[in-house]
Amino acid sequence: MATVDRWLLPDGIEEVLPPEAARIEVARRQVLDLFQSWGYEFVVTPHIEYLESLLTGAGQDLDLRTFKVIDPQSGRQMGFRADITPQVARIDAHTLRREGPSRLCYAGSVLHAQPRALSSSRSPIQLGAELYGDASPSSDVEVISLMLAMLQLADVPDVHMDLGHVGIYRGLAQAAGLSGAVEQQLFDALQRKAIDEVISLTEGLPADLADMLRSLVDLCGSREVLGDARRRLAGAPTSVLLALDELLTIAERLSVRFPDLPLYFDLGELRGYHYHTGVVFAVFVPGVGQSIAQGGRYDDIGADFGRARPATGFSTDLKTLVTLGRAEVELPSGGIWMPDNTDAALWQTVCRLRSEGQRVVQALPGQPLAAAREADCDRQLIQQNGLWQVLPLAS
C-alpha cells in the first residue's frame, strides 16, 4: 500500500473533526434530554452480535446492509449493527419484559455494507425512540409528535411529512390471494408508480380487487386523498377500511398539534413493507433526495423474541440533523492557560476552576505563550502576591 493510500477512508465512511464533532455531541445530548422529558429511557445496544440475533425479525434489506464477520472464539457468524431498532425491540420483548407500555430511546453509530442512497453515509449516527405495548393511534401520534419536536429543536426548516399505511396494500393482496412472487412484483411496481406493470400483474383478478389495487398508484396527495380512498376502496376488506380510519385519526390529531405542517398521503407508499405492519411516515425537506427522519408501526417483531408487543417508533441520522438544522449550538469557547509549574497552590486553583466548568489547558515544557491562542485560550493563570489569578492573556 502506498503511503498516500494509508490516509484514505472507504467510500461512505467519514471522520468528524473539531468543531463539528463537538456540535454533533452537543446536539446528541440535547435530543436525548428532549426524549427523556417525554418519558423515554436511554438504552445502549451492542455494536456486534451473532447474526441470527441481529437479523431476527428484520427483512432482507437489513441483511444486505449488514457487515458480516466470523467470531474467532466461537466460529459463529456475527454482524455489525446496521439498524438499532431490532435490538431495542429485543430489549423490550426479552430483557425488560414489562407488562405495560415501555418508552425507550437510543443513539449510536451503525455501519452499512450498502448505503441507503447513492451519496449516503455508510456510518451514520442513528438516533431514535420507540414506544412498545400500545396498539392505538395515540402511540403513533406520540412518536410522530416527538419526531417533529426533535426537528423543531434542531430548527430544520421547510419540513413536510408523508404518511401511508402498509395495511392497505397487505389487506388487498391477501384478499386477492396473490402468491408471494406476484405480491413482491406488484410491490416493486407500486413503488415505481409503474401503472402498466400494475395493470399487467392484476389481470385475472376479480374486477373489484384489480381496480382497488390499481388505484393505489394514484391515491396520493393532500388530505382529500383519504376521502377519495374511502370511495374507491369502499368494497375493500374491513382491515383496509380500519387502516384508512387510522390514517384519518392520526392526520386530524397531528393537524391540531402542528397546524402549519404540510401532510402528504401516499397509499401506495410501502416503505418497510416486510418490516412495518401499520402506519408509516417520513419527513422530507427541499433539496434532499431522501427522508431525513422516518418510522412506523411494527407490531410483529417482538414475536421473534418470544413475546409479541405492539410497537411504533422513528429514527434519524444525527449527523444529517446537525447539518440541516439552523439551531445555534453553543460550544465552549475560550479557556485558561496554565503554566508548566509544579506549585501545589496552582494545582488546587486549577482543580477548582475545572470543577466550576472552566476549561483549563496546561502548557507543556517549552511551549511559548503564543501556543495558548492556538489552544483557544483567552486568559492565563499568573501568580501575584503569592496567589494564582486568572487574567487576560497577554498580547
From Swiss-Prot:
Keywords: Amino-acid biosynthesis, Cytoplasm, Histidine biosynthesis
Underlying gene: hisZ
GO cellular component: cytoplasm
Assembly: Heteromultimer composed of HisG and HisZ subunits.
Keyword Cell membrane: no
Family classification: Belongs to the class-II aminoacyl-tRNA synthetase family. HisZ subfamily.
Pathway recorded for this protein: Amino-acid biosynthesis; L-histidine biosynthesis; L-histidine from 5-phospho-alpha-D-ribose 1-diphosphate: step 1/9
Name this protein carries in UniProt: ATP phosphoribosyltransferase regulatory subunit
Protein function: Required for the first step of histidine biosynthesis. May allow the feedback regulation of ATP phosphoribosyltransferase activity by histidine.
CDD domains: HisRS-like_core
Further facts: This function is generally fulfilled by the C-terminal part of HisG, which is missing in some bacteria such as this one.
Keyword NADP listed: no
Predominant place of localization: cytoplasm
Gene3D superfamilies: Bira Bifunctional Protein, Domain 2 (3.30.930.10)
Places the protein is found: Cytoplasm
HAMAP family according to UniProt: HisZ
Biological process, per Gene Ontology: L-histidine biosynthetic process
Highest taxon of the lineage: Bacteria
